[in-house]
Amino acid sequence: MNDYQEEKNSLLASHGKKRIVLYAPTFSPKLTSLPYMMEALEKLLRERDIVLMLKFHPLTKSEWCDQYREWASSQPDAIYIESSENVTRYQMMADVMISDTSSAIYEFLLLDRPVITYNAIAKDIYWENITDTARLTEAFDKVLDDPSAIEKRKWICRNYDPHLDGKCCERMIAEAEDYIRRHGVPARRSLNLWRKYTSIRTFGTISKKNKL
């Protein structure tokens, strides 16, 4: 849990700030908060004692990456992280995460740290969700100290992954290997058109002669 504590402390000291906030939105054009969040993030930077890290999914449209990269360069306490880097490092350093409908939300909640989302589509929401970006700063203040928000995070940890022994990945791999031994590997995956398009754009098509 504390692998990145020294790096975090150094970053906060260099900026003279108290907390790190990670903005990690989804790449999906229909679900991403990127078109709406910049003004609210700038207000949060201006009014609260934070360093803001921006970490986007590798499949995020380049125009959004370019726009936020340029914006971050004009903000003394904003750091744009290239999408090729692993988000886990920055999740471990962050005190609060801002997102929308990214799966990274659940990863961060399991660290027992607060999440704020904009227009999340999840059926069950165990974090602070806003539908107006003007409420971002208010939501930030709430998630830090509100007892109900803290209890929701505790519930997620207890019910989704109560194991804190550092061996979750070992268990997951063992279960996956056991499933493959019993059921084999599916010949095809059922993907929607957008997932197919982004996968092909990123990784290319697989030649039939190269298939297992």
Model-derived segments and spans:
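Catalytic cores of nucleotide-enabled group-transfer and carboxylate-activating enzymes in metabolic
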Residues: 7-9, 20, 99, 106-107, ...
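Short, solvent-exposed loop/turn segments at secondary-structure junctions
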Residues: 26-30, 58-61, 103-104, 121-123, ...
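Short, conserved active-site loop motifs that form the nucleotide-linked donor/cofactor pocket
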Residues: 50, 77-79, 127-128
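A donor-sugar binding/catalytic signature common to diverse glycosyltransferases
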Residues: 84-127
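C-terminal "capping" alpha-helix adjacent to the active site of nucleotide-linked donor transferases
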Residues: 131-148
